[in-house]
């Protein structure tokens, strides 16, 4: 759907398939806003395993993308040639920690965000014309994030006065709300150091094969740091959940 007034200008929606980015696309369609494509960058754990929580990845590829394409919105999927595992096992090449594996990314200084997500997006953005307009999913009740918008970025949620809760309800009504909102209020990779306890517990309970992969990485020697997040090793979290399970079984 291309604007007649600016038919040479591209309009692209950045899409994580969370509530805010999907609500942005739904609003564009509802109000006849120009929209040429949605762009999604998938971070990979390894060459075959997605970094998306499995329920969210299934929603993306089995529900959301087919639905958007039926509505006339093509979806472009970007990926880095680097995976989480590539970066985790990669060696530091300079400084006092030279030779050590990078290990778990630091909260607030995530090399995965930088190398596996931002770089593919920036590489793609360089192929676009300078006047390309980017729709971003920032709600009307997020003033700090709205203040950071650059000149080529537009929030349709702000334009149509949609809060985060409004965006969630819009997606729910349209049958396009990711199932991850049943146990979290945020998006993120299943190996994210910023993951909340409830998200980690979901991974532990429902995806033991992925949990085991993280314990394998914890056991890998020669890492810069043993901490998974700011305070704990992944094995500490595992031990805490096992203790919780044991107490529940004893109480039963």
Language-model segments: residues:
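Nucleotide-activated chemistry modules centered on ATP-dependent adenylation/adenylyltransferase
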Residues: 1-252
